Regions:
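Catalytic cores and adjacent flexible loops of soluble metabolic enzymes
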Residues: 1-318
Length: 318
């Protein structure tokens, strides 16, 4: 597949931080940024800009907050752009510098469809400071179609560059990705639509390809799939698939060998039966993460069948 408009956004540090409370050493993050930059990755997302009133710096690493000084220790000006994510309702409006004074190019606003008004308000504030803005509608598999349509119609009226289709729970199959991709693209003329997939059913790469075929032009990936629970589409697969001469997979392969094989053994992201169960049942992974933690600590966790049965009774949207 070669389409020059397609861009890759690597979210290893941001999404992967959900597995280690963003406790990545700065020398490692610097190596990750440099490797991804040399690989030609278009955007490198280095974490969240979170309000310390909600998250204690004593319990979370620096990439939960992405202070400008910390970012400048690991990133540098190059063709790859720095991205940072913000959560609706967990962000201090006073924490943003004018874009001309920041190494950050884009902020991605993570929101649920029901909070789209707040997301647009935050996005407008960020946009007024000169940044690129993306809105990522989380948990699309839990959104009623009428609610999604209303959110997309509102986003169509903004001047934000990007809107993302997000399969937060790894629930979607190809038919749903194709249908939703067409919906987003039809409702958002003039905007670039992105896709972020989780690998609960080992479909993150396949579903990303389906999005590409339909016309999605910015793709989320992470090195070795690092991310919450089952993880994400892998950056290295995207680099190999896109056949764009600007991309070079070799720096990412070197990073995997140096850092991520060991980290995966320690943190246990990737396909596991409990994560698969939460995916096929369209459930938040908090329960499967708790199950896996109990197994790792030698605590009673129950059988897979017992876990499946327990998830059948869960009715929770967050």
């Amino acid at each position: 597949m070669y389409r020059p408009e397609i861009k890759i956004l690597d979210c290893t540090i941001r999404d992967g931080g959900l597995m280690n409370n963003w406790e990545f050493p700065k020398p490692m993050v610097k190596e990750v940024f440099d490797g991804l930059a040399r690989a030609g990755v278009d955007y490198i997302e280095l974490g969240y800009r979170a309000d310390k009133a909600f998250f204690s710096p004593e319990k979370h690493g620096p990439w939960r907050f992405c202070a400008e000084a910390d970012l400048r220790e690991v990133a540098y000006e190059c063709d790859s752009k720095v991205s940072v994510m913000v959560d609706v309702g967990r962000t201090d409006y006073d924490d943003f510098l004018p874009a001309r004074d920041s190494i950050i190019t884009m902020f991605r606003v993570a929101t649920y469809a029901k909070e789209i008004d707040k997301a647009i308000h935050l996005g407008n504030h960020i946009k007024s400071l000169g940044y690129e803005v993306s809105v990522n509608i989380m948990a699309a598999s839990h959104v009623l179609e009428i609610e999604l349509d209303e959110a997309l119609d509102q986003l169509a009226q903004t001047n934000f560059e990007y809107v993302y289709l997000v399969d937060s729970f790894g629930y979607f199959y190809s038919e749903q990705v194709q249908w939703l991709s067409e919906k987003y693209l039809n409702k958002l003329p003039g905007k670039t639509v992105g896709i972020h997939c989780h690998n609960n059913q080992q479909l993150a790469f396949a579903n990303t390809i389906d999005g590409i075929i339909k016309g999605i032009n910015i793709l989320d990936g992470s090195i070795y799939g690092m991310g919450r629970a089952a993880g994400n589409c892998t950056t290295e697969l995207l680099l190999g698939f896109l056949k764009n001469p600007k991309y070079d997979i070799r720096p990412v392969l070197a990073l995997i060998e140096k850092h991520f094989i060991r980290m995966k053994d320690e943190l246990k992201w990737g396909y596991e039966v409990p994560y698969m169960i939460s995916g096929i049942l369209n459930k938040h992974p908090r329960f499967s993460l708790e199950y896996m933690k109990n197994v790792a600590e030698g605590k009673p966790a129950g059988s897979f069948v017992e876990f499946y049965n327990s998830q059948m009774t869960v009715n929770e949207l967050d």
